């Protein structure tokens, strides 16, 4: 029996996506909704005991109309999220089954996650109590004042861009959320709350392919990534991201028309 519960945070507002007709997580990506793509690696993972999908209350009618049968078939627990991300996770935590010892939180707008990435971050969470995918900062970072004039260049050594999944011992995460009010309003991810309790979260090397959709251009990039992953399936041997270089090295062999609509 699996030890992990997965919370899919799907209650965002998609204000920057630029489609007045639908939110980004309901957009079609290679024949399936983005949120379903984000769930794929968890659906086939043997350590996952429960999946909770937290949607915006105003999306309930749309979700039930489009996805009720799929959610029932996949045995998903679909709940209403809150006004902010932390509110959504707090509500989902209340629904985690007693048997689950670890909780993974994943953005519904990250549809290119692979099962190898999931296995790596699950393993690190078992060993260390808390783990997240992240990528090293490669660009030069500038700090500015409110006037947008630069004040300093921030050293990028040991700086990382946090991704999801972020995975925690259940008791650590529940304790962190019990003290959420003390963290203030500026909570941007779940590791921030766990760190406030004095716990350290280990970083597992992530991938730039595990992008978070923000704009419709990101949707085109995600389409390309999924097609590449389909052409170059990942194996379980070696470290989980060993094949990325080969994938991108072979990219010129694909026609642009294979990846993007004209």
Feature locations, PLM:
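SAM-dependent methyltransferases
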Residues: 1-5, 190-191, 208-210, 219-262
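Active-site nucleotide-sugar/metal-binding loop of Leloir-type enzymes
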Residues: 87-102
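Conserved core of the sugar-phosphate nucleotidyltransferase
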Residues: 112-204, 243-262
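Short, high-confidence coil segments that cap the C-terminus of an alpha-helix
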Residues: 48, 100, 126-130, 199, ...
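Residue-level signal for inorganic ion chemistry
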Residues: 8, 35, 92, 106-107, ...
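Structural beta-sheet core signal
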Residues: 6-8, 53, 105, 130-133
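Conserved donor nucleotide-binding strand/loop of the catalytic core
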Residues: 71-83
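N-terminal glycine-rich phosphate-binding loop and ensuing alpha1 helix
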Residues: 1-61
């Amino acid at each position: 029996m699996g030890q992990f519960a997965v919370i899919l945070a799907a209650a965002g507002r998609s204000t920057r996506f630029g489609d007045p007709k639908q939110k980004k997580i309901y957009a079609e990506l290679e024949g399936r909704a983005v949120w379903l793509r984000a769930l794929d690696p968890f659906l086939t993972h043997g350590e996952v005991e429960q999946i909770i999908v937290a949607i915006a209350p105003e999306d309930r009618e749309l979700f039930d109309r489009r996805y009720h049968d799929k959610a029932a078939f996949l045995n998903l627990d679909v709940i209403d999220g809150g006004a902010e991300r932390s509110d959504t996770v707090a509500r989902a935590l209340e629904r985690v089954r007693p048997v689950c010892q670890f909780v993974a939180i994943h953005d519904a707008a990250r549809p290119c996650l692979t099962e190898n990435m999931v296995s790596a971050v699950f393993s690190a969470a078992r060993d260390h109590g808390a783990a997240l995918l992240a990528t090293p900062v490669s660009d030069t970072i500038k700090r500015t004042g409110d006037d947008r004039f630069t004040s300093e260049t921030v050293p990028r050594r040991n700086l990382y861009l946090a991704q999801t999944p972020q995975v925690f011992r259940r008791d650590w995460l529940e304790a962190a959320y019990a003290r959420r009010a003390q963290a203030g309003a500026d909570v941007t991810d779940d590791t921030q709350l766990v760190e406030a309790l004095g716990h350290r979260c280990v970083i597992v090397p992530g991938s730039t392919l595990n992008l978070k959709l923000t704009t419709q251009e990101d949707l085109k990039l995600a389409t390309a990534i999924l097609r590449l992953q389909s052409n170059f399936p990942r194996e379980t041997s070696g470290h989980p991201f060993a094949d990325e270089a080969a994938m991108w090295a072979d990219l010129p062999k694909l026609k642009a028309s294979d990846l993007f609509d004209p």
